[in-house]
Amino acid sequence: MKFIKQFIALATVALAFNAAHAADEAPDALVKRISSDVLNTAKSDKAIQAGDTKKVIDLVETKILPYVDFQRMTALASGRFWRDATPDQQKALTEQFRQLLVFTYSGALSQVKDQTVEFKPLRADPTDTDVEVRSQVNQARGEPIPLNYRVAKGPNGWKIYDINVLGAWLVETYKGTFASEISKGGIDGLIKALTDKNKSLAAKPLNTAAPKK
């Protein structure tokens, strides 16, 4: 989907964490510090800019994906249907959704150019374990774009489980797609649809690897 591609392209500008500090650092400070490193790498690395598949995916795998709570994200996107899925179905669904976002994050990273990120003051108490980190993406042309994250703290530190661009949450956007596929073919039908989409994306250059209608 074109809208989801925009979601991920913007979110990738700031979506990154670091394991060594994940449990100790404030969530907004953590995102700000590490996102700067990822953004600078994406801008300066010619191989990434050219869409070098292995290099881009390696960056996504090491800097972004370990600190996204994919199981929680998948469960929320699946809604009430998640409870009806078997453990094996839940595992397969989470794996395919994760792979879909791997391709999408990677495609977005290869297109990062002149964007910068500005973070807003964190509205949370020190003891809070579920917060919203607010930011905006500044572009050379056009108005700033609001970009917020829902971040929860668990045993292994802070992890993102939802993203908001222009007032719409990513999980809610996928929820409609998931429900439509489930209504047609059940949980297995959704897993197959995601698997087929991932196979299709794997055969394309990174700069086109994003879900489309």
PLM features: what roles do these ranges have?
Residues 17-23:
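Sec/Tat signal peptide C-region and signal peptidase I cleavage site
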Residues 144-172:
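Short beta-strand edge/turn micro-motifs at domain boundaries
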Residues 25, 40, 44-55, 84-88, ...:
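Surface-exposed, polar/charged faces of alpha-helical domains
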Residues 103-145, 197-213:
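Surface-exposed, charged secondary-structure patches
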Residues 1-8:
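Bacterial N-terminal signal peptides that target proteins for export
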Residues 162-213:
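Low-complexity, intrinsically disordered terminal/linker segments enriched in charged
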Residues 9-16:
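Bacterial N-terminal signal peptides
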Residues 24-105:
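Early exported N-terminus immediately downstream of N-terminal targeting peptides
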